[in-house]
């Protein structure tokens, strides 16, 4: 069996905007869960989430940004870090033997709701041509392939919270099968109330720790009462 190794990492998350920051936060046991006032105003049971302190509009060229929802923009920044970490040249990135498999747990619900509201208030012609690459379930891989001129395999896997793990595993198998020499793999999610409300309605998210959000994430604790939604890309 062909041995596969990880040569570069890139992360944008609630505990850091790059690998170094995330590593430090993990060593310090830092929580990225915070109170979200909007969720309280909307009447959500769960009023906490993993938020980001990052202005993607300042970091992504607007010509690329117009095609991206926030999740795809996070992915773009994480991939930029991974490329630098791996020391890949432009020709190695944009190469027939280089591919990308990266996804998200669902579509960009905020963009879908926005398009619906625009259609209702102003008509369908006002929706604009950039909403599809922002909203579709394959927005992450599509935007990465376009921005970095990926010439090899490019697609998304969507499998809820397992999306990133499945994408990474699929990338490993792709290289083992000889279909590619290099693969970018991972997953990303943006945070928007239009998606959060679905999980809140299910009662799947933590609501006991709204006043102490840093204590909400307790995956293996007997007192856990649900997960915390968040935005990130790895």
What are these model-predicted stretches?
Residues 3, 97-99:
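Residues that mark the start of a beta-strand
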Residues 7-9, 102-105:
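Glycine-rich beta-strand-to-loop/alpha-helix junction loops that act as flexible
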């Amino acid at each position: 069996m062909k041995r596969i190794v990880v040569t570069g990492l890139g992360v944008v998350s609630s505990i850091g905007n790059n690998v170094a920051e995330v590593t430090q936060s993990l060593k310090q046991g830092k929580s990225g869960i915070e109170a979200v006032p909007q969720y309280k105003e909307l009447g959500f049971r769960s009023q906490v989430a993993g938020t980001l302190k990052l202005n993607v509009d300042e970091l992504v060229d607007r010509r690329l940004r117009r095609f991206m929802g926030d999740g795809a923009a996070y992915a773009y920044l994480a991939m930029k870090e991974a490329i630098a970490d791996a020391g890949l040249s432009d020709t190695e990135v944009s190469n027939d033997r280089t591919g990308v498999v990266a996804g998200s747990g669902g579509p960009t619900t905020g963009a879908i709701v926005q398009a619906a509201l625009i259609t209702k208030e102003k008509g369908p012609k006002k929706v604009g041509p950039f909403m599809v690459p922002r909203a579709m379930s394959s927005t992450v891989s599509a935007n990465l392939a376009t921005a970095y001129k990926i010439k090899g395999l490019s697609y998304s896997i969507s499998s809820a919270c397992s999306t990133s793990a499945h994408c990474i595993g699929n990338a490993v198998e792709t290289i083992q099968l000889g279909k590619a020499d290099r693969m970018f793999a991972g997953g990303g999610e943006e945070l928007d109330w239009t998606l959060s409300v679905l999980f809140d309605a299910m009662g799947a998210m933590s609501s006991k720790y709204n006043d102490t959000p840093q204590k909400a994430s307790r995956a293996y604790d007997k007192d856990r009462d649900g997960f915390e939604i968040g935005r990130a890309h790895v």
